[in-house]
Curated annotation (Swiss-Prot):
Cited InterPro entries: Oligosaccaryltransferase, OST4, Ost4p_sf
Assigned keywords, A-Z: Endoplasmic reticulum, Membrane, Signal-anchor, Transmembrane, Transmembrane helix
PANTHER family, per the entry: DOLICHYL-DIPHOSPHOOLIGOSACCHARIDE--PROTEIN GLYCOSYLTRANSFERASE SUBUNIT 4 (PTHR48164:SF1)
Lumenal side: 1-4
Major location (coarse): endoplasmic reticulum
Coiled-coil residue windows: none
Membrane topology: Single-pass type III membrane protein
Cell compartments where the protein resides: Endoplasmic reticulum membrane
Protein known as: Dolichyl-diphosphooligosaccharide--protein glycosyltransferase subunit 4
Record field: transmembrane: 5-25
Gene source species: Drosophila grimshawi
Subunit and partners: Component of the oligosaccharyltransferase (OST) complex.
Amino acid sequence: MITDVQLAIFSNVLGVFLFLLVVAYHYINANTGKSIIKSK
């Protein structure tokens, strides 16, 4: 069985990964938007 500690570590790692994925998505999306506006 999965212990409470293993579940806590898994959920924390998953939360950090999803948070970084959202930050990376917004960073890439903001940069591409600026470059498209500058190129016009």
